[in-house]
Amino acid sequence: VVNGRLNGDRLNDEQLAAHALAYLATELEACRQLSAWAARVGGEFEGKVARAYVGELARNLRGGVDLGACENIALADLGLTDADLADTLLHPEVQAFSAAHSTGAIYLEIAQHARDKGFGNLGLDDEMLEEIRGQFAKFSDQKVIPIAQDVHRQDKLIPMDILEQMAELGVFGLTIPEE
């Protein structure tokens, strides 16, 4: 920061660290929101999903921030010390939490529940939103899923009739303010 503004040259020099910090901030917020959702809806399944996500992230971050191929940033490169890690990611309670809540058996339970009973309470708490969700699920099941694999594997464009039907559902106007 120079004169209260980000220094573009410095940011460019530290772009891997900046990318890692942005990733960490995003993951932290995802953990907060997922945990808040699970607490709000109060279901056992939803809590299991949130705990698995938090536990998996805590376990994965021990090795650094993995941003993709050839982009793994060591936590020390972000200024974290061994003492910082001992108090957080390497703390015995955090490791025990990860070991208890982010296992292959837990993931299998989550997948089986999702397959057999759905994805749990989405917490929409709005009849209209639930109806919209149902309409989109029906559209996806009837129109998208039957052609999705072919479109993907052959790298085809999404057929215009699908896009037109999506437009009729209001997809392309969802983010445009009414005024």
Locations of regions flagged by a protein language model:
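Flavin-dependent oxidoreductase catalytic core characteristic
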Residues: 1-178
